[in-house]
Design a protein with these regions (language model features):
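Short, polar/acidic, helix-capping and beta-turn segments at strand->helix junctions
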Residues: 1-159
Length: 159
């Protein structure tokens, strides 16, 4: 599956970044009960954090791209945690947090940046449940933060 996703990313003009290290006292992923829980990931574009508040100093297109970059980081975390993407069975849920001005109400459209990329990469297995929430501030002034729950196949040596 990893090769197919790498090809699809190339067709889209995208590439997986290196999985980001945690910025505080947590781990990036936890595998439990056939699920991989992925901590909130921030959007990076060419190594720079995508910052700002949607509806104030950033527009919907910027938010969409930021959500897409968060999704890329989620896939990078899957690959790092699982040693590839071969164990990914389906994307179960995304939790999307959008740094929003009080009158910005297009959080679902921002979240589509991540949702549409997951469907492009994983097909029907990439279609997922989702929350899209506006918040007044995010860590490091990030424009978007997304966490995920992913169903995975048992790994080698699993009981």
């Amino acid at each position: 599956m990893t090769d197919r996703i790498d090809r699809k990313l190339g067709e889209l003009g995208l590439a997986l970044p290196q999985a980001a290290a945690p910025v505080a006292a947590y781990v990036p992923t936890v595998e439990a009960g056939g699920l991989l829980h992925i901590s909130g990931q921030l959007p990076f574009d060419e190594g720079a954090l995508m910052t700002g508040r949607l509806g104030a100093d950033r527009d919907l297109d910027y938010g969409y791209r930021a959500a897409q970059r968060c999704a890329l980081m989620l896939v990078a975390q899957m690959k790092a945690a699982l040693g590839g993407l071969h164990r990914v069975e389906r994307i179960v849920k995304l939790g999307v947090f959008v740094n929003s001005a009080a009158d910005f109400t297009d959080q679902p459209k921002v979240a589509n940046g991540a949702s549409e990329l997951m469907a492009e990469l994983f097909g029907d297995a990439g279609r997922h449940a989702r929350s899209a929430v506006g918040v007044p501030v995010l860590p490091l002034n990030a424009a978007v933060e997304i966490d995920a729950i992913v169903q995975i196949a048992p790994g080698e040596g699993a009981v």
